[in-house]
Amino acid sequence: MNKGLLTLLLLFTCFAHAQVVDTWQFANPQQQQQALNIASQLRCPQCQNQNLLESNAPVAVSMRHQVYSMVAEGKNEVEIIGWMTERYGDFVRYNPPLTGQTLVLWALPVVLLLLMALILWRVRAKR
């Protein structure tokens, strides 16, 4: 009985790391590389901090297949990322554009660093 249980446990362990594999057929290796590059730049809207290649959420699979089909249609990276941004918002981009809304996010670290340097300089000047 213990031998059978151990065999069953080992069998399940082999399949514990199984993942979903995309079987999308590309016309050439360049298209495949382009599609994978674009999908790695886009964030899954459902899973925090995972790109479309890493996530197996249904929305990520759908978005990944959309990227693949758009690459197969001959669309370039700018068109595909633009379409995804239009549909899902700037959140899907790992590098959001510099706009009025994101300016605070880009400028805040620099402002805080300068503020800390000023405070440190004043404290040292008093001594």
UniProtKB/Swiss-Prot annotation:
Keywords: Heme, Iron, Metal-binding, Periplasm, Signal. The keyword Glycoprotein does not apply. The keyword Lipoprotein does not apply. Residues 1-27 form the signal peptide. Its main location: periplasm. Disulfide bonds: none annotated. It holds the Pfam family CcmH. It comes from the Bacteria. InterPro entries: C-type_cytochrome_biogenesis, CcmH/CycL/Ccl2/NrfF_N, CcmH/CycL/NrfF/Ccl2_sf, For-dep_Cytc_NO2Rdtase_NrfF. Disruption phenotype: Triple nrfE-nrfF-nrfG deletion mutants no longer attach heme 1 (covalently attached to 'Cys-122', the CWSCK motif) of cytochrome c552 (AC P0ABK9). Belongs to the CcmH/CycL/Ccl2/NrfF family. This is Formate-dependent nitrite reductase complex subunit NrfF. It comes from Escherichia coli (strain K12).
